[in-house]
Amino acid sequence: MRKGSIRLIAAASVIALAITGCSSSSDEAANTDTEFEIFTWWASGGEAAGLGALVDLYKAQNPETEFINASVAGGAGVNAKAVLESRMAAGDAPDSFQAHAGLEVIASYAAQGKLEDLTALYQSEGWDKSFPADLIKQTTLDGKIYSVPVNIHRANVLWWNPATAAKAGITKAPETLDEMFADLEKFKKAGVKTPMVLAGGEGSWAMAHLLDYVLVASMGPEKFEGLFSGSTSWTGPEVAEALKVYQRLLSYGDKGKNSFGWGEAGAAITKGTGGFFIMGDWASAQWQNEGAVLGTDYTFAPGPGTVGIYQWLSDTFTLPVGAKNRNAALAWLKLSGSKEGQDAFNPLKGSIAARTDSDLSLYDDYLKSAAADWAKDRLVGSTAHGVTADNKFMASMNAAVGKYISGGAKDNAGLAKDLAAAQAAVVK
């Protein structure tokens, strides 16, 4: 990866030294456990299909272990995280659970003493050579590694229906915010029901996802990252300008559908009733699972204003302290981090492998393009999906966005103040 792509504290050589020189509590043992419970929010569509492929491999490798799928539906884990927190507080941790790389894993779980150190597992599996060093750092605290990345998703993707765009006179993907607004006007004049597809349900996470993208597109990567380092103010002019862009985008949405979840809202693209949709690349897997065809029913481009920028997130699996079926969990983690596991999971999930040696012949044209961009673009961590923010900030961001929208998307200054307060509460 490139300088400036993901902000790091230590170099790759330090990570390699830690992996080869540290012991950990994650010592290997044969899986003699009779049960294994995995906790995710992958309950439907392409997400469930991807998980299912991984589960099938696990069952084949561990035929004596009963697999318990404890998935809790809800995009971005808004429901699952609340259930997980209650379970862990009650001493009822699942054997492994899904968490995003970055501050979600590091601050929300590892720093709270809720996860076992997996450094020895990385050593035994050779993952220091299989995963990008910068990505390993996003699961590392005080030299210890706490989760296993299974994929890479791209958050800043623009989706549209080619036939709908052609009818509106749109012949190429917009590359700038100004070009996107010009195209939204074309959709509007052509009678497209929803020029900008919005999804305000499921705790407003998809609207926070849209804001996350707008901040990067409007401010640029450095100013955006400064929001979390302290060099950019949430109440400063850069955010104020970005919120004007956000407010303007919302004006092109269908206000009657603001309560829709992302899947229900996004169906407007493949049905031809929607114009543009900013959503992560899991949308492609969802649509393909519903029978849509890439290139015919929908197509893609980097979000306008973010060409050459890859706003990323990574799903990872953990080993909670106190897991009842620890050996079964270790078997799951080994599979999740393996080439076989990742190449079975990711083509169906709509993501690329976290590993650097995946077989790209198994991936569709969108995912091949994502892999190429991941290797060359400027990488920026997603806030809405846990890279640059912990669970506390994400919940506050979702609440602030929900409040803003329910108030008619009018109080930009109030939204900025709420986001500043959320950040201040985290860094205290």
Language model feature labels by segment:
Residues L184, F228-N258:
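Glycine-centered hinge/linker elements that transmit conformational signals in sensory
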Residues S351-A354, A370-A424:
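C-terminal capping/gating helix-and-loop segments adjacent to ligand/active sites or protein-protein/ligand interfaces
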Residues W41, V55, K244-A328:
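Extracytoplasmic/periplasmic substrate-binding proteins
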Residues T119-F131, E175, M196, G200-G201, ...:
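Short, solvent-exposed loop/beta-turn-alpha elements that line the ligand-binding surface or hinge
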Residues P94-D95, E125-A163, T194-L198, T299-F300, ...:
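A structural signal for short loop-to-beta-strand junctions that line the ligand-binding cleft
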Residues I106-A111, L135-K172, F181, G200-G226, ...:
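Periplasmic solute-binding protein
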Residues M1-E37, A60, A421-K428:
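Short, low-complexity disordered leader/linker segments with a strong preference
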Residues L57-F131, Q138, A166-G169, E175, ...:
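Extracytoplasmic "Venus flytrap"/periplasmic binding protein-like
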